Amino acid sequence: LVAAGPVADDVFDGYFSRASAGTRILNRIGNQTASEREFHTVTGSLRARGVSAVHDLGHRLRAAYLAPLLAPPSPIVLVVPCRADAFNRLRSALQSIGDTLGEPGLARTVVTVSNQDATGWQVDVDLLREYLGGQVWGIETIPYDEHLGMGIVIEHSKLAPETRAAYERVSAAASAVAEGRPERV
């Protein structure tokens, strides 16, 4: 769950457990997630506060119990670490989205390249845009930021201005998808 500011606990106590890092996890039992009503209640509460929910689905895209999270107009943000091995898996991840949700699912996908090494392999984003043009909604990049690799909760203000701006672009792209704006790569 990502929030731009504090969100009162009273809204979430009935729906979430709290991880040791302070993040909130929407209730889940076995292969059942929260009910559709719970998703709508939480989403409405977040929107009223000007913040958004982020659901990390990992590799479980095809799990039936996650279908409510993938329903239109929900944006799909596919994060790809800027490493050759991760880019080798990009094609299969996009194919999985296409196989599961069809072309409309791909059209709601924002591919986000996360640079995790200041001196490591760099992707040619223009070439990636050329390759994926017309298939996905957009492509964004997150620059390397030493704070992101620390493995702890990070204050927004501690991130480099370029990193904050990049996350704001990803957020704006996700909002545009959710609002049905048709811009694509």
Predicted ranges, named:
Residues L1-R24:
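Phosphate-binding loop that captures ATP/GTP phosphates
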Residues V2-P6, S96-L101, R108-T109, R129, ...:
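Acidic-aromatic/histidine active-site loop/patch
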Residues R18-L69:
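Phosphate-binding/switch loop-helix module in NTP-utilizing enzymes
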Residues A21, P72-P75, E103-T109, Q135-W137:
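Short glycine-/polar-rich loops that comprise or flank the Walker A/P-loop
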Residues L26-I29, V54-D56, V77-C82, T109-Q116:
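Conserved beta-strand segments of the P-loop GTPase G domain that flank and frequently precede/overlap
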Residues S74-S92, D117-G120:
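Conserved Switch II/interswitch segment of TRAFAC-class P-loop GTPases
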Residues N115-A160:
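Beta-strand-loop-alpha "switch" segments that mediate conformational coupling across diverse proteins
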Residues G151-V185:
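NTP-binding/hydrolysis catalytic cores, primarily Walker-type P-loop NTPases
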